[in-house]
């Protein structure tokens, strides 16, 4: 199994276990059935996650794919509710007389709160999974998504529907390919992914610093720094990088699905389904924001 880049899956519950060793997760001994049989069972669960009834995780006290799917859906329900709040809050001051009064406060509160909670969840989940913190994270992410979506929609009407459909398409195709066994994570691909991720983070940091120090004056070509001001063969740099980042996010989803499947094979306690749902949300939110920015760059000043 290739290790996931998502910090939510750094917990031993989602790591491949060496024969004869028991992972130290909540002082619980995991199932000891053969790896091959467990792998087949986990694969069958994933393929039938949306068609089969609940696998009875309440009775077994173990993590299942179906239960993780239910937890993921519940987190996104919370996100959608608070996203509506963030959207309304962002546009509350906009009137025909003051069309420029778009508030970025929900966006900033959501981003900061989500980041802090993500760090807390990641570093405390090795000892205990706290669903309440994950619920709060989903709520803050909703404020962030609602705020940034309202702002982008104000600038580029119709962009939110485009980004949402594109995100759902990427997630759906990735899940279908993984469930069918046609796409799997590998150690080599994961190494390339990690290198690309580090490179992208460094580039993003440099881009933000340049924007902060006025390297790209207003009206110089776009609001995204190097992403919208530089071109390669006539194509905005942001489009080229954006496509690559969407592919990276899709592969990150594959790693997330693989980690959840590994947790099921390990017989992880049921509460770790919340951690799996949290990890999926982190990746999907990242994917949506990247697609939103990519479409904005493509649409330019239209």
Language model: regions and residue ranges:
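A hydrophobic alpha-helical transmembrane-helix feature that marks the membrane cores
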Residues: 1-302
């Amino acid at each position: 199994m290739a290790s996931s880049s998502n910090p939510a899956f750094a917990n031993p519950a989602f790591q491949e276990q060496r024969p004869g060793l028991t992972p130290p997760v909540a002082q619980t001994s995991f199932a000891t059935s053969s790896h091959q049989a467990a792998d087949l069972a986990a694969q069958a669960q994933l393929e039938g996650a949306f068609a089969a009834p609940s696998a009875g995780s309440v009775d077994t006290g173990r993590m299942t794919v179906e239960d993780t799917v239910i937890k993921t859906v519940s987190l996104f329900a919370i996100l959608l509710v608070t996203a509506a709040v963030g959207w309304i809050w962002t546009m509350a001051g906009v009137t025909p007389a003051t069309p420029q009064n778009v508030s970025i406060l929900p966006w900033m509160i959501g981003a900061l709160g989500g980041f802090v909670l993500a760090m807390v969840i990641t570093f405390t989940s090795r000892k205990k999974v706290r669903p309440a913190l994950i619920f709060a994270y989903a709520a803050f992410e909703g404020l962030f998504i609602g705020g940034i979506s309202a702002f982008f929609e104000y600038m580029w009407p119709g962009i939110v529907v485009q980004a949402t459909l594109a995100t759902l398409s990427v997630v759906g195709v990735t899940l279908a390919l993984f469930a069918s066994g046609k796409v799997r994570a590998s150690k080599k691909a994961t190494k390339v992914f990690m290198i690309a991720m580090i490179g992208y983070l460094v580039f993003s940091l440099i881009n933000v610093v340049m924007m902060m120090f006025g390297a790209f004056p207003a009206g110089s070509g776009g609001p995204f720094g190097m992403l919208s001001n530089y071109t390669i063969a006539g194509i905005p740099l942001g489009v080229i990088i954006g496509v690559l980042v969407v592919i990276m996010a899709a592969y990150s989803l594959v790693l997330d699905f693989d980690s959840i499947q590994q947790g099921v094979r390990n017989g992880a306690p049921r509460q770790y389904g919340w951690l799996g749902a949290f990890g999926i949300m982190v990746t999907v939110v990242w994917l949506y924001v990247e697609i939103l920015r990519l479409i904005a760059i493509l649409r330019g000043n239209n």
